[in-house]
Amino acid sequence: MKLTHFPERIIWFQSLFIYPIYLSGTLFLFNLLQVWILAGYAIFWQIKLSVGPEDQINSTDIRHWRSIPPLIWAWLISMVGMGVTILIGLYENDYNSNEFIRSTISWLGDWSLLGIYPILGYLLPIRPAIIYRSACVIAAQSLIAMPICYGAYLMKLPGLIYLSPLERIIQNGKSYYLINWYSREVDSDGIRFVLFTPWGPALGLIGCIFFFYALEEKKLGWKWLGILGSLAMLVTSVSRGAYLFLPATIAIVWAIRNLSFIQLQLSLGTSFFLGGLGSTLLLDRFQEASGGVKSARKSSSQLRAKLEQAAFDRWTDSPFYGHGKQIPGPDFLKNMPIGSHHTWIGLLFTQGMIGFCLFFIPLVWSLIDLSLKAKSSPIAHITLKALLLITFASFSDNIEKLSYLYWSVFLLIGVTYRQPLHVEEEFLLGK
């Protein structure tokens, strides 16, 4: 594939060498540098366009910042506001300057990416095909990595290879710097792969996203390697959530694309009516299914429930700006941080109602707008699927911690708005 612009070369380099970068313990740092290199490139061109001749704007593929749509601005403003909210929460809870520095560094590596990448996707000439092919390349490499990781398990090698010394320098959490062959399941003592991600559910989420990317690949060979690799990532992650997210996303987006607004209303109305008639039976079946899923990893489900309850109970101590950061839990929570394992309850605990709204508003706005565009835009269609997956995952994980892995989704949000799309009024009119 011909790489026509510098930003595409940066993305392609990361996909080609993701496993060497991971094994060196620098994947988080590399992805952090990637966004700031691209941001610097975008700023350079914005200055050049501002001081250069008027016709230069039309002679380059770089978009001018004045044309950035409101939704893209909303992501940036909200994520900057998130950083300010974190600092206010730390100040109100009397944390020292070291915590201010650590939290600022953490913000630069998680929440800030959700605000920067949509703008980069809009301003810079990055083709979606590069993102799709890159996902297929990573998935193909993962097909090679999995037998090696399983061989390490058969040879009874320890799951942990080493902890990168970068953790002592950046200090934003050990999980980003643990280099693993595999990880152990708590309940069954079985194994699950994490590959280049920090934990199993993260691999499951990335596998789901890459699956949708692979379906868009034009070259048949890369397409099938991407599909097989992404599904293998999903299966070997042993993530209960990911097993449900994929079919749910397919069903929801199919309904959005293929049913008119009136048809959706009729379908939902009929479903609710029939559901009401058989509500007792349906509730019993749902509870049985839910209990089966939770019992598959009972101790994990119980721990998550306790963490969520503890975070929700403590939220009222600082309802508006939160506690500023996650705090270590007591022994009965196995010292897991309060505010972890659930994005929304975690937001209430760490950033309060202000932080909750700062993420909720641009996310819901994006989902609605992409749903309207998905009928007429293939890029909006794939972006909607990927963003829905992240939304589902937010109810079982702190998804901001994984933004350095799924950054391509937010890049695609910006790419979607580069093109002159028109919302199909027929959808709203039911035609």
Describe each PLM feature range:
Residues 132-159, 171-237, 243-256:
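Alpha-helical transmembrane segments of multi-pass inner-membrane proteins
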Residues 220-222, 247, 251-255, 351-391:
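Hydrophobic transmembrane alpha-helices and their immediate junctions
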Residues 282-351, 370-375:
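Long extracytoplasmic/lumenal interhelical loops at the membrane interface
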Residues 34-46, 382-391, 399-431:
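Transmembrane alpha-helices of multi-pass inner-membrane enzymes
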Residues 2-8, 45-72, 214-227, 258-266, ...:
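Membrane-interface helix-loop-helix junctions at transmembrane boundaries of multi-pass membrane enzymes
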Residues 4-25, 37-120, 387-394:
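N-terminal hydrophobic segments of proteins, predominantly signal-anchor/transmembrane helices
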Residues 7-20, 369-397, 406-416:
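Loop-to-helix entry and N-terminal half of a specific, functionally important transmembrane alpha helix
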Residues 83, 87, 147-156, 254-295, ...:
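A membrane-periplasm/extracellular boundary helix in multi-pass inner-membrane enzymes
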